Amino acid sequence: MNQMNPAFVMPDVQSTVDTRQIPIQRVGVKAVRHPLTVCTESGDVQPTVGVWNLDVRLPADQKGTHMSRFVALLEENRAPLTVERFRAMLASMLEKLEAEAGRIEVTFPYFVNKTAPVSGVQSLLDYEVTLAGESRNGDTRLFLKVLVPVTSLCPCSKKISQYGAHNQRSHVTIDAELAADLPVEALIRIAEEEASCELWGLLKRPDEKFVTERAYENPKFVEDLVRDVAQRLDADERVAAYVLEAENFESIHNHSAYALIERDKRQAA
């Protein structure tokens, strides 16, 4: 077995000068799976698994970044994730990598315990959540994105049919830039309350009757859905800007209906 000479200094190739003089806007690690815990609206802690993307800006004269430091950052941050801890984590990454700009993004399944509307039976429903932060020239922006599955029912189908109406599962995706702390549950509630009906993991027959009739009494086109959710986001001071999408997986077509609204509330409409 070869023994390393204790006097030998391993070269740091990444820190050498690059003569091509081309800056790299984003360089780092992608799709790193790592356990994390998140704080819920009620103050409980929920264990989950995050898929992380971490990157920084690399100056034109620097050959490479220090890839191991990204993973080391995850190992050092095992405390339950909050918006403030996430902000501090972003600042720590820039310090460790000696970078002027960088971005962290983590996507994870988030579970909410829901109570069925009639029977009261409880079950979990999962939502896809992404927390992202980017820092540049001392300015830090944080984003909270959640994909909410809901039910939509077609107003036209209801109007022209003697009975019944076609309905389907839909996805409402809210990507909000935060002006203040905003619980994941708050965005979930907005999407579910503005849909024809929300979803549950477990329903009994009386519950199925309720959700069927609830959707029938609250029909919405995909245009109605995004506009109603947008009104709620416009009224929420915790949201500075947003990209809002709705996709209906049409039950009578082999394609989806889709709508998008994008707004920065800091700018005049």
Swiss-Prot record:
Q: Which reaction does it catalyse?
A: GTP + H2O = 7,8-dihydroneopterin 3'-triphosphate + formate + H(+)
Q: Which GO terms describe its biological process?
A: tetrahydrofolate biosynthetic process
Q: Key word Acyltransferase present in the record? A: no
Q: Any idea which GO molecular function terms this record carries? A: GTP cyclohydrolase I activity
The superkingdom of the source organism is: Bacteria
Question: What's the EC number here?
Answer: 3.5.4.16
Mind listing the UniProt keywords for this protein, alphabetically? Hydrolase
- Biochemical pathway: Cofactor biosynthesis; 7,8-dihydroneopterin triphosphate biosynthesis; 7,8-dihydroneopterin triphosphate from GTP: step 1/1
Pfam families, from UniProt? GCHY-1
Site, as annotated: May be catalytically important = C154
Its family remark reads: Belongs to the GTP cyclohydrolase IV family.
NCBIfam families recorded for this chain? PRK13674.1-1
Question: What does this protein do, in the record's words?
Answer: Converts GTP to 7,8-dihydroneopterin triphosphate.
What is the protein named? GTP cyclohydrolase FolE2 2
From what organism does this protein derive?
Burkholderia lata (strain ATCC 17760 / DSM 23089 / LMG 22485 / NCIMB 9086 / R18194 / 383)
Lineage, top ranks: Bacteria, Pseudomonadati, Pseudomonadota, Betaproteobacteria, Burkholderiales
